[in-house]
Amino acid sequence: MIGKLKGTLDEIDEDHCLVDIHGVGYVAYCSARTLAALPSPGEAVVLFIETYVREDMLRLYGFQSALEREWFRLLLNNVPGVGAKVALAILSTLAPADLANAIALRDIAMVSRAPGVGKKVAERIVTELKNKAPAYAGAASGTIGLKQELGEGVAPAPITDAVSALVNLGYSRDTAANAVAAALKTAGEDADASKLIRFGLKELAR
């Protein structure tokens, strides 16, 4: 089982790249985001690898980060009807943090922006992964957890009121949730809505 490739980038194609390791070329299929982040051919490259084995095929999928690979696994192993091609399309359209945000907020429209992902598939992704998003949110896990509470309507009243107030001021729901999450760290978990709004506006002014 191959978990990582470290070698020289030989070439980049539309949906894959070729990595040379001591004279052996490895083809790794990648998301558009990973391909865009690759260095120029001839330079050193490191890819996190998921080895996909079927009766008639062995294929390597490459990712620029371990977190992106974890999301690929999450989509592939937990959402019926989502194969490798669709999972890569999703990760080409949404960065892991954006995907976690969309799932936490139950933003079907955001998830369905990926090619090949219709409304039904997007709904299935949100339903199947809503409880897993915070654990796979990377550094933004606290913010994702708050957004999940907002999406489920179970966030404490001061938080809900603060987010609503910022939205009424013209900020997007996602931006408002980020600001309030940051405000919570400064103002404390027991802060009232007015304090969260005040600290949230300070965050937005930075």
Curated annotation (Swiss-Prot):
The entry's keywords: Cytoplasm, DNA damage, DNA recombination, DNA repair, DNA-binding
Residue ranges of the region described as Domain III: 154-206
GO molecular function: ATP binding; four-way junction DNA binding; four-way junction helicase activity
GO BP term, pick one: DNA repair
GO cellular component entries: cytoplasm; Holliday junction helicase complex; Holliday junction resolvase complex
Annotated stretches, region: Domain II: 65-144
Annotated compartments: Cytoplasm
Name of a matching Pfam family: HHH_5
Cytoplasm found in the keyword field: yes
Transmembrane intervals: none
HAMAP family: DNA_HJ_migration_RuvA
Family: Belongs to the RuvA family.
NCBIfam families per the UniProt record, alphabetical: ruvA
Complex formation: Homotetramer. Forms an RuvA(8)-RuvB(12)-Holliday junction (HJ) complex. HJ DNA is sandwiched between 2 RuvA tetramers; dsDNA enters through RuvA and exits via RuvB. An RuvB hexamer assembles on each DNA strand where it exits the tetramer. Each RuvB hexamer is contacted by two RuvA subunits (via domain III) on 2 adjacent RuvB subunits; this complex drives branch migration. In the full resolvosome a probable DNA-RuvA(4)-RuvB(12)-RuvC(2) complex forms which resolves the HJ.
Name assigned to this protein: Holliday junction branch migration complex subunit RuvA
Organism annotation: Mesorhizobium japonicum (strain LMG 29417 / CECT 9101 / MAFF 303099)
Gene name of this polypeptide: ruvA
